[in-house]
């Protein structure tokens, strides 16, 4: 029986795996839903997709369903289909595969004869073999067993988006689907088995707004973008790829979708199969990405096929090698149940779409059974650096959203694109290798991947990136051999982002983390400013700033309390944000506000959430993010930041945290006096201005101007999302050199944004000063706060900081864009001078250029290092104050430029000048044009001719300009002096407060000491009393316990007695009943006996009477006989006498 049961179970498992054509209706529906949800999903665009997808049987665990389908559904599907076909072709060359995607599809179809028609659910011929193979592999973890999870359709709803990064499912794409899907380019509709993955696929469409239902960024889902760009910091690397690569919006999208689809399906695939299939799918997706730039269909298909083949081969080779990191194992184990069925569906889909058996099936079959050229080619491609990887690099640039959908891991192919997305630590690994790594990692999560993922991390295995090997996968090193390295997680180029391994799944779509998705990822000690070892210390305060000001007793309080205004809007300092999985713990001085240390990302990490820097988000951060989008700057998590498990969720939006937090922390670390002088100024000014114009930071900064990215999932997400990153000037995105997390790369990080000018977006509601940015040694918020305070003081006009900034930003906004472009081009920001609104006079320009000079910013940064605050607080405070003043001067210069324009206008019309306060920004061009118009309007009958008037006007203008310059200079001096006076007053006030506090300090100390002594005595007495009380209580308790025991004994005895009494009563009753019965019975017997006795007696009497009568008779007879006898005797005697007489007579005779 046991054998029979096991056999039946095994058969069930095989049946679950093998009937690829048998897809539970729920699954098909879920697949359909997912495809429908996918904006660019093949299902959505292809009329036949739904049909194909519906029949899709639960994807074989070994073959994850393709998860994401890009907007270029045709490309994605085709690429998926071709990806398997190209597996064969890839042996020849990726270019060849691209050249002949269609032929490959037929070829692949031939190799997979069992695949059903596009509309038919296909159980690849290889599938039985696969099933056989998979059955031995099948395990609960692989979802091979027939379980509700595998049988039930995986729902498309974005479940806590399982980090799909690795999920690139084996490209099950079947080459033939082209006829099936008119909308798609001969690409089989890819079913996203995993709900989260389906969401990724939905996101796959390049610009599709994120569909993640969770407010937190789902790594799987791109951030919704109002405009062309989605500023998904996680997907910034994608953006970078985007820029670096030719914008193959359709192809990239399709590829991205494909990648996400594959990745997603791979997640659900059982570890071993998924490893192969994922490797195939990832490679295919990588190749698709490569081909995508060239031709959306053929290129994508060919590349995808080639990548798929190589991935399949490599994955086949690598399956045993891959070992997924523990976090991946957990996540995948968790996700596998749902994911595995999806994989089956995906396989079925490809089968349905094209007669070619699903790539996954065919790949294993081809690889194992038939030495199909595809398998060999794929293996070769995997082993080789992967020619396609370069192409995938170009192809990688998908739409940000599509990139997000693909999720760096999913977009393994696309993502591999040489430009690592800024948001992700993109490693320039080959897309194929990246895809392979992602695939392998993902499948490793299910089975082999763990080993490979860990061992094969990017050649550039940044220690921190290891945490986010998913991220690494996202940026798969282009040179990695898919066969071996695909397993390695691609460390995102940003080792600092260091997402938790758990995020591998989540990260691909978005830094979720966490999520995020997410709890599996161990929190790196480096993540926290404080050492984990300190956590055991009862005195250790996880929420306190990591480094305490050496000299400032108040530091602990203020260090944690940074500008409430700034902090309020951007982040809750105590708010645990799983979104910022990596909080820079670089310098103890860095100002980190720990998210709740215990908060786990989405994954439910038990590890304390990493302290998340909560620098206030500012437009500068947005600028940084934008720059990162342009590949010039890379948003990079602090190298020490450890991935915060998310997820899933992890609320996955890592906030880009500029180095500025360090500046803030440094301020915090300054001595009390300095701190009071500097921070109080800063905060006071900010409170004055920021309070007025403070708007809930949740309003996304106007990056929408650049990126139309205003549709972040939530402002809070944006904040966290940006804050978790530090913008670091990226080395060429294509560079594959690992960046040491510890290496001080951050000087490049400090973009020189003029606070008002360079901020890419003038978001009036957003305080540029809101978050300290690395741009200036002092946080911009500090500078702006001071400037704004000064401005308000100068100009009583009650207008919030935003309003004051708008005039400054109106013109500067464009320069900031130029600046960004320049940065993207590699030109120094300083090259772009931001001048007063229309252009300032020479003096104004000179001042602006001097102020804007990067040396001032970078120089300031040089000494505004986080360590400086601790090492030399006074110097730090002084320098910080100087920086703040300098920033104020810069802002004032802009204002002066405006004022100059106003002054020139005032010279023309004093009344008009009075009408416009100096704050009003009037373009000088407009001003002069007005002046010119007024002059021209003079009656034509004027004595002077136009030339004379023009010359006179020029002279007058020159004079006006000179005067304006003088005015601006004097005004500058006045403002500076006034500002200095105000600042000094504030400083003096702070010092006075400090001194006032210090003077009574001694008395307080004495009193407190005495009080402490008294309290100590009282405490001792109380302790003694407490001890006696405790003793008495202990005695009482003992007695009580004894009494309880006695009572319990009595109770037990009573209960026993009661039971006995009841038993006896019952017995008595029973005995009585028996007695009564016996009595009745005895009575009956007695009666019967008496009757019998009476009868007997009657008979006896009768008999006795009879016997007596007979006795008498006999007696009478006896008497008669006796008489007769006596007579006889007498007669005899008489006879004898006679005889004697006779004899005697005879004798005698």
UniProtKB/Swiss-Prot annotation:
- Name the coiled-coil region(s): 877-905, 948-1148
Q: Where is the composition biased (Pro residues)?
A: 155-180
Q: Where are residues bearing Phosphoserine located in the sequence?
A: 100, 265, 354, 419, 510, 514, 552, 582, 585, 587, 596, 714, 736, 759, 771
Signal sequence span is none
Record function comment: Plays a role in the microtubule-dependent coupling of the nucleus and the centrosome. Involved in the processes that regulate centrosome-mediated interkinetic nuclear migration (INM) of neural progenitors. May play a role in organizing centrosomal microtubules.
Q: Whom does it interact with, and what assembly results?
A: Interacts with microtubules. Interacts with YEATS4, GCN5L2 and PCAF. Interacts with CCDC100/CEP120.
- Return the protein name: Transforming acidic coiled-coil-containing protein 2
Organism, by scientific name, is Mus musculus (Mouse)
Q: What is the lineage of its organism?
A: Eukaryota, Metazoa, Chordata, Craniata, Vertebrata
> Corresponding gene?
Tacc2
């Amino acid at each position: 029986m046991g054998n029979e049961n096991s056999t039946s179970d095994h058969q069930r498992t095989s049946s679950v795996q093998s009937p690829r054509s048998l897809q539970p209706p729920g699954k098909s529906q879920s697949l359909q839903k997912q495809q429908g949800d996918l904006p660019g999903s093949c299902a959505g665009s292809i009329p036949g997709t739904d049909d194909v997808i519906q029949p899709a049987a639960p994807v074989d665990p070994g073959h994850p369903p393709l998860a994401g389908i890009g907007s270029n559904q045709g490309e994605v599907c085709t690429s998926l289909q071709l990806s398997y076909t190209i597996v064969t072709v890839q042996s020849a060359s990726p270019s060849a595969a691209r050249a002949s995607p269609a032929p490959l599809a037929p070829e692949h179809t031939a190799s997979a004869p069992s695949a059903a028609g596009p509309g038919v659910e296909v159980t690849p011929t290889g599938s039985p073999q696969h099933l056989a193979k998979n059955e031995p592999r099948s395990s609960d973890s692989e979802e091979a067993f027939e379980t509700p999870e595998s049988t039930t359709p995986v729902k498309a709803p974005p479940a806590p988006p399982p980090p799909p990064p690795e999920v690139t499912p084996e490209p099950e794409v079947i080459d033939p689907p082209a006829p099936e899907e008119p909308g798609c380019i001969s690409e089989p509709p890819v079913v996203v088995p995993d709900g989260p993955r389906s969401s990724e696929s939905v996101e796959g469409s390049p610009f599709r707004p994120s569909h993640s239902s969770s407010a937190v960024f789902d790594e799987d889902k791109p951030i919704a973008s109002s405009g062309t760009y989605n500023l998904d910091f996680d997907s910034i690397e994608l953006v970078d790829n985007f820029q670096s690569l030719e914008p193959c919006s359709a192809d990239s999208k399709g590829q991205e979708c494909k990648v996400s689809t594959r990745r997603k399906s791979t997640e659900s695939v059982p570890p071993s199969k998924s490893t192969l299939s994922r490797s195939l799918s990832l490679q295919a997706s990588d190749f698709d990405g490569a081909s995508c730039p060239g031709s959306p269909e053929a290129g994508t298909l060919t590349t995808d096929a080639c990548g798929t083949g190589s991935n399949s081969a490599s994955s086949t080779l690598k399956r045993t090698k891959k070992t997924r990191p523990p976090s991946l194992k957990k996540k995948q184990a968790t996700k596998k149940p749902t994911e595995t069925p999806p994989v089956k569906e995906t396989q079925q889909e490809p089968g349905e779409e094209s007669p070619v058996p699903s790539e996954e099936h065919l790949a294993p079959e081809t690889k194992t059974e038939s030495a199909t050229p595809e398998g060999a080619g794929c293996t070769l491609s995997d082993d080789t650096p992967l020619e396609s990887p370069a192409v995938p690099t170009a192809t990688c640039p998908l739409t940000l959203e599509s990139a997000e959908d693909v999720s760096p891991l999913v977009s393994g192919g696309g993502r591999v694109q040489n430009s690592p997305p800024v948001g992700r630590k993109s490693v320039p690994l080959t897309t194929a290798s990246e895809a392979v790594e992602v695939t392998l990692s993902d499948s490793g999560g299910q089975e082999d991947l763990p080993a490979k993922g860990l061992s094969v991390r990017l050649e550039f295995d940044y220690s921190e990136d290891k945490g986010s090997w998913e991220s690494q996968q996202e940026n798969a090193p282009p040179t990695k051999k898919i066969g071996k390295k695909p397993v390695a997680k691609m460390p995102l180029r940003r080792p600092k982002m260091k997402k938790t391994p758990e995020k591998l799944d989540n990260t691909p779509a978005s830094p979720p983390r966490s999520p995020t998705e997410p709890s599996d990822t161990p929190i790196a000690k480096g993540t926290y400013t404080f050492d984990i070892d300190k956590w055991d210390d009862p005195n250790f305060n996880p929420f306190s700033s990591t480094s305490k000001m050496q000299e400032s007793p108040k530091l602990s309080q203020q260090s944690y309390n940074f500008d409430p205004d700034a902090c309020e809007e951007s982040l809750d300092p105590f708010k645990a944000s799983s979104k910022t999985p990596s909080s820079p713990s670089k310098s103890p001085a860095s100002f980190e506000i720990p998210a709740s240390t215990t908060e786990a990302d989405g994954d439910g990490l038990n590890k304390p959430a990493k302290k998340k820097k909560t620098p206030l988000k500012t437009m500068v951060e947005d600028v940084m993010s934008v720059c990162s989008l342009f590949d010039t700057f890379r948003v990079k998590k602090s190298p020490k930041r450890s991935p915060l498990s998310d997820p899933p969720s992890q609320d996955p939006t890592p906030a880009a945290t500029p180095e500025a937090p360090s500046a803030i922390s440094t301020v915090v670390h300054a001595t009390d006096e300095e701190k009071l002088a500097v921070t109080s100024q800063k905060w006071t000014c900010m409170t004055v201005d920021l309070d007025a114009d403070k708007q809930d930071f949740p309003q996304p900064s106007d990056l929408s101007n650049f990126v139309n990215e205003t549709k972040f999932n939530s402002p809070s997400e944006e904040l966290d999302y940006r804050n978790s990153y530090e913008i670091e000037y990226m080395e060429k995105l294509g560079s594959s050199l690992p960046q040491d997390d510890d290496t001080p790369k951050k000087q490049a990080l400090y973009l020189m944004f003029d606070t008002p000018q360079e901020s890419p977006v003038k978001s009036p509601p957003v305080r540029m000063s809101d978050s300290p940015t690395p741009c200036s040694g002092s946080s911009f918020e500090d500078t702006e706060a001071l400037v704004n305070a000064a401005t308000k003081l100068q100009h009583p006009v009650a207008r919030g900081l935003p309003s004051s900034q708008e005039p400054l930003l109106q013109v500067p906004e464009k320069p900031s864009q130029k600046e960004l472009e320049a940065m993207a081009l590699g030109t120094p920001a300083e090259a772009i001078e931001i001048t007063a609104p229309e252009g300032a006079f020479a003096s104004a320009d000179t001042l602006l250029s001097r102020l804007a000079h990067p040396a001032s910013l970078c120089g300031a940064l040089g000494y505004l290092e986080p360590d400086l605050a601790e090492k030399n607080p006074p110097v730090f405070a002084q320098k910080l104050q100087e920086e703040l003043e300098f920033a104020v001067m810069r802002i004032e210069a802009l204002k002066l430029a405006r004022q100059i324009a106003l002054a020139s206008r005032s010279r023309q019309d004093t009344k008009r000048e009075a009408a416009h306060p100096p704050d009003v920004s009037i373009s000088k061009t407009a001003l002069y044009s007005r002046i010119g118009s007024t002059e021209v309007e003079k009656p034509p009958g004027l004595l002077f001719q136009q030339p004379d008037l023009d010359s006179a006007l020029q002279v007058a203008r020159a004079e006006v300009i000179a005067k304006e310059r003088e005015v601006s200079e004097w005004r500058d001096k006045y403002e500076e002096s006034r500002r200095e006076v105000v600042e000094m007053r504030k400083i003096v006030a702070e010092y006075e407060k400090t001194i006032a506090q210090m003077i009574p300090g001694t008395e307080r100390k004495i009193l407190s000491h005495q009080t402490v002594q008294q309290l100590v005595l009282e405490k001792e007495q109380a302790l003694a009393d407490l001890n006696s009380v405790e003793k008495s209580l202990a005695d009482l308790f003992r007695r009580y316990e004894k009494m309880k025991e006695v009572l319990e004994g009595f109770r037990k005895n009573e209960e026993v007695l009661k039971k006995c009494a009841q038993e006896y009563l019952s017995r008595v009753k029973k005995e009585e009943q028996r007695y009564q019965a016996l009595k009745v019975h005895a009575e009956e017997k007695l009666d019967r006996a008496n009757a019998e006795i009476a009868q007997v007696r009657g008979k006896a009497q009768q008999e006795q009477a009879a016997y007596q009568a007979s006795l008498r008779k006999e007696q009478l007879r006896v008497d008669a006989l006796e008489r007769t006898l006596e007579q006889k005797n007498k007669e005899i005697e008489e006879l004898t006498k006679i005889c004697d007489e006779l004899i005697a007579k005879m004798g005698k005779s």
